[in-house]
């Protein structure tokens, strides 16, 4: 009956406005009666059902657990050992002391190293860089006082320096030793900043060698500040600075070297090439302090060697140009 009436209404095109209003009113009333309408959702019912389901599931779990504790038989000793066998042996815990790292030495052979020892090496290398920076950025007297209080720091520095030297393709010290070996006459040689006194070890029988450094690492070394040498005026034929012009008071070192040298004596300097701001200005500055340049040459791409002869005339005590950049190692 409802469909018939809808069809009749749809065919009445062009009907007057009053008739249309009646039709719309009838359609609204029919929709209210329930034809073609959806039921309203009741979300609170679903919530209640979910809570009830959860509660029931929890109760079932409690019941099941109680039953299992009552009915489960106790395992015998034999069954327990069988279970252990099935599990297999326990994995050994990782012990860093026992672990070893394979590395290649200088000969190319694989060498096993303990990671703890490796970590200690890295710490020592870091402290060496710190000490190295300190030596290049303080005066000689400050460095002397520092190492006097902490002898272990000096030992650590020299170990680190020895490790660095192993990586160098050449060392100016070898050139100086060859030069001294070629000297026919016996010379009084002062090795300033000597380290382990390698010059005294190599040519000590041929020449009279006095080795000076901030700390005496062996019997051949005299401990002192290089700007205050325990020696008389004009007592040396040769004064050597091999990679040892490290303090900020370079003028004091050169002045002291001139004091202990006899007139005509040789001041020999071996230094890293990259430290020089200007090689020409460096030589001119030393010449003004009472020397003349007799030899200047580059040993390799890394090192320079200078020979100066002491003369009587001193033009300036603190000339311009006597400057060296600090030789700092890159941080890793």
UniProtKB/Swiss-Prot annotation:
Biased composition (Basic residues): 38-53, 82-94
Keyword terms: Chromatin regulator, Methyltransferase, Nucleus, Repressor, rRNA processing, S-adenosyl-L-methionine, Transcription, Transcription regulation, Transferase
UniProt record, GO biological process: cellular response to glucose starvation; methylation; rDNA heterochromatin formation; regulation of transcription by glucose; rRNA processing
Positions with biased composition (Basic and acidic residues): 95-109
Broad class of enzyme this protein falls into: transferase
Positions of region (Disordered): 1-109
Domain of life: Eukaryota
Amino-acid positions noted as binding S-adenosyl-L-methionine in the UniProt annotation, renumbered to this chain: 158, 193, 213, 225-226, 242
Cellular compartment(s): Nucleus, Nucleolus
CC per GO annotation: chromatin silencing complex; nucleolus; rDNA heterochromatin
Entry keyword annotation includes rRNA processing: yes
The protein's Enzyme Commission number: 2.1.1.-
Tagged with keyword Signal: no
SUPFAM superfamilies listed in its UniProt record: S-adenosyl-L-methionine-dependent methyltransferases
Molecular function terms from GO: methylated histone binding; methyltransferase activity
Homology family: Belongs to the methyltransferase superfamily. RRP8 family.
Cited function: Probable methyltransferase required to silence rDNA.
Full protein name: Ribosomal RNA-processing protein 8
Organism expressing this protein natively: Caenorhabditis briggsae
Record lineage: Eukaryota, Metazoa, Ecdysozoa, Nematoda, Chromadorea
């Amino acid at each position: 009956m409802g469909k018939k009436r809808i069809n009749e209404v749809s065919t009445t095109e062009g009907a007057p406005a009053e008739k249309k209003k009646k039709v719309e009113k009838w359609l609204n009333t029919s929709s209210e009666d329930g034809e073609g309408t959806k039921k309203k959702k009741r979300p609170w019912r679903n919530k209640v059902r979910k809570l009830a389901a959860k509660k029931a599931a929890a109760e079932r779990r409690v019941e099941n657990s109680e039953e299992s504790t009552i009915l489960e038989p106790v395992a015998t000793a034999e069954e327990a050992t069988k279970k252990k066998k099935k599990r297999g042996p326990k994995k050994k815990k990782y012990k860093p002391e026992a672990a070893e790292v394979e590395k290649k030495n200088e000969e190319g052979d694989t060498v096993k190293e303990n990671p703890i020892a490796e970590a200690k090496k890295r710490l020592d290398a870091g402290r060496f860089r710190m000490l190295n920076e300190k030596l290049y950025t303080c005066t000689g007297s400050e460095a002397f006082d520092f190492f006097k209080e902490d002898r272990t720091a000096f030992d650590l520095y020299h170990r680190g320096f020895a490790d660095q030297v192993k990586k160098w393709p050449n060392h100016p010290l070898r050139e100086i030793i060859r030069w001294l070996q070629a000297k026919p006459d016996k010379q009084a040689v002062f090795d300033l900043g000597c380290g382990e006194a390698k010059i005294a070890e190599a040519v000590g029988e041929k020449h009279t060698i006095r080795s000076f450094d901030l700390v005496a690492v062996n019997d051949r070394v005299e401990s002192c500040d290089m700007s205050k040498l325990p020696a008389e005026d004009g007592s040396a034929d040769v004064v050597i600075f091999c990679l040892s012009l490290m303090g900020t008071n370079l003028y004091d070192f050169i002045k002291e070297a001139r004091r202990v040298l006899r007139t005509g004596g040789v001041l020999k300097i071996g230094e890293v090439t990259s430290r020089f701001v200007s090689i020409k200005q460096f030589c001119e500055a030393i010449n003004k302090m009472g020397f003349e340049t007799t030899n200047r040459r580059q040993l390799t791409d890394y090192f320079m060697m200078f020979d100066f002869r002491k003369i009587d005339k001193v033009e300036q005590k603190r000339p311009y140009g006597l400057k060296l950049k600090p030789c700092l190692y890159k941080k890793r």
